[in-house]
Every structure is written in structure tokens, then in C-alpha cells.
Amino acid sequence: MPSYDPPLRPPKQARSQRTLDRISQASLELMEEGGVESATVAAIVERAETSVGSFYARFSGKDDLIRYLQDRIWSEARNRWDAALAGQDWGALSIESVVEGVVTLLLRSFRADYHQREVLGRERRQDEEGARRVFEFHQHILATVTPLFLAHQKEITHPDPEWAIRLGYRFAVGAIREILELEEAVGVVDGAATADGLIPELARAWIAYLGAGGPDPASAGSGEVDFFDPWG
């Protein structure tokens, strides 16, 4: 894969950082309200209470801004994920609780910036940079959760535990993404599955695929662990 240069170097001065933060926040708000097209440079600087010159001192144009916002959102998501993992003593948990915890954190992670990712993603979903961001984020999550699962490898009866972890991850992420898309489109429908209600079901399915958890996989999803939540 070709090398990639970030669209912006971090500001060295606090004042410059505050201006950048205001531009970023204003841009995201406008894009969430009316799509990428509504976030014109004029509208962005007006809401950010800054100048057109300040915008172009940082970005060559809106395409450059979008690249920066995408990098920022995925980087912050990765940092919050790492903080959530670090906030739990995973070694003290059963494999059922580990799986449930990972699914819980996946839902919180994807839900936190879901709309922003979707708004920005529609603009560049098929390009190489967008694919790189998504790939690297998921690879990072898999690299961090695989050791948590393999700490219970003796309980996993699947002939290829690492493959079962990867495929189970894709299954869980796909289900979470689908239900978040549904909730975004039509809201929470009475009688329909909710994203939070999906957690124990995905945990049971993943545990069953791993061949772990003893004869009663229904013990998953008990919710006895209160996981640290950096998403608020």
C-alpha cells in the first residue's frame, strides 16, 4: 500500500489548536445537519467564529478538511478503545465475560461516532485512504482483543481459535453496524431488536462458534461486569 501523508501537522501553539478545534467542530456540526455539501467554507468559518484566512492557513480546501476530520475521528476512536480496554482487569474474567465485554465495547465504539463516520464516509467510502483508515482500525481492535480470547485457549474447542476469533469479530461488527443503520434510519421500533439487546445474543453466538463456555452458552450476557466507558 502506498505511503500516506497526513493532511495537517498538529499546531504547536495553544491558540492555533483552539482555532483548529473550532473549525473541526463547526464542520462536523454542519455536515451532520445538512450533509457534506452544506459545510461550505463560509458557513464553517462563520460558525467557528474565525476567518477564511484561518481556514486556508490550515487546509487547502474542503477535501483536505474532510481527510483531516476522517483521520481525527478514527484516531480518537482508537484512543478511546485503548482506554476502555486498559480500564478493565481482563485476566480476572471468565471467557463468557470477556466475549460479552468485547461486544459491549464494540457497540459503544461504533455508536459513539456513528453518524459522523457515515456522513464523512459517504464522501470518500470507495477511495484508498478511506479503506486504509477502516482496515487499520479493525486490525488494531483485533490485535488487542485476540490475546484476551487466547488467554482462555484451553476452553476453546474450535480447531483454529484465531480464525474463530477473527470471523466472530466480523460477524459481531456486521450485526452491530446493521442494527445501528436501522436505528439511524427509523429509530427504535417497538418489538424490534435493539442494539443494546443484541449484546448478549452476539456474545452467545460468538462463544458457541469458539466452542467455549461449557455446555450452557446461555450463561453469556449476564452483564455482571461494569466496563469503563470512555464514550460517556
Language model: regions and residue ranges:
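Short hydrophobic clusters on alpha-helical segments that form packing/core surfaces
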Residues: I23-M31, A77, L106, A172, ...
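Helix-turn-helix
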Residues: R22, L30-D64, Y68
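Generic hydrophobic, amphipathic alpha-helix propensity
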Residues: R15-S27, I44, L69-W81
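Hydrophobic/aromatic-rich alpha-helical bundle segments in the mid-to-C-terminal region
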Residues: E118, A131, A151-A203, G213-V225
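Hydrophobic alpha-helical connector segments
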Residues: Y68, D82-R111, I165-G168, I199
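Hydrophobic alpha-helical bundle segments that form small-molecule/ligand-binding pockets
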Residues: A83-A92, A112, R117-E118, R125-E128, ...
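N-terminal intrinsically disordered/low-complexity leader segments
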Residues: M1-R18, A185-V188, G214-G232
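Amphipathic, non-transmembrane alpha-helical scaffold segments
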Residues: S16, L20, I66, Q70, ...
